[in-house]
Each structure stands twice: as C-alpha cells, then as structure tokens.
Amino acid sequence: MLKHYSHDGSVEIVCNKTDNSTKFVFYLGGDAYSAPAILISDGEASKLYYLHRDYLGSIVMLTDENGNIAERRYFDPWGQLIKVEDAAGNTLDKLTLLDRGFTGHEHLQTVGLINMNARLYDPALHRFLQPDNYVQEPLK
C-alpha cells in the first residue's frame, strides 16, 4: 500500500497495489486531527462519514450521513486497539473505513504500530521506538 498526503493534510490518497484500487479521503473542515467529517471516494462513488472523538482526539466512532453507526472503535489507555465493530455490532479484525484512530494518528495495522508523525509508537510496549530528537534539558 502506498499513501500520498496533501501539503495541508486535508487529503489522503491510498493506492492499494494488491487489488490495484485507489481511495481518496477528504478531511472536511480541518485536517486528520480536527476534522468533524470525511468524504471517502474511489473516484466514482463517495460516502460521507462523521468522526466522533473522545477527549484525547481518538476517533471512537464513525457515523454515516443519516447518523447511523458505521464503525465503533475501542482503545486501551495506551492506544492498543481492543475492538472494532461494524454497524451491526459484528467484531472486525481491523479498522476498515479509516486507518486513523488513537489520538487521530495513523495506525500501521500490519505491524501493530501507530505513526505519530515524528516517531513510531508501539501501543503494546507503551513506548516510542525512537528517542525524542528534541531534548530540552539533556542533563535532566
């Protein structure tokens, strides 16, 4: 899978090399961390979803344009994905509509990590995989 991002973060283009498909995600009214809604399109058909976030900014539910639940997500306090449910309450094995979840960041589901932009975070270890490049007080 290959992903492209717009300069302002309002559009993601996801190219799936396995099935040769392309998906466009438009963040409406903000970027991936603040938008209240998204429009997902394959270039022909499109679907509007509203993003429901918790106090950390994690996307915990997506609803369609009629207010029906499309996907519900549950995270532990460290960002580990506990459960994903579809509209009927069936358990899914991964995030299906949007790969952003904990604190609005991108989940790299094949390896179980979260891309926090500057560093990768492992929710199972509760640790970042790289040191912080910006250390304010190195002697403390």
Regions found by a protein language model. Name each.
Residues 94-100:
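Flexible glycan-contacting loops in extracellular carbohydrate-active proteins
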Residues 66-68, 77, 89-90, 122, ...:
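A short acidic/small-residue loop/turn micro-motif
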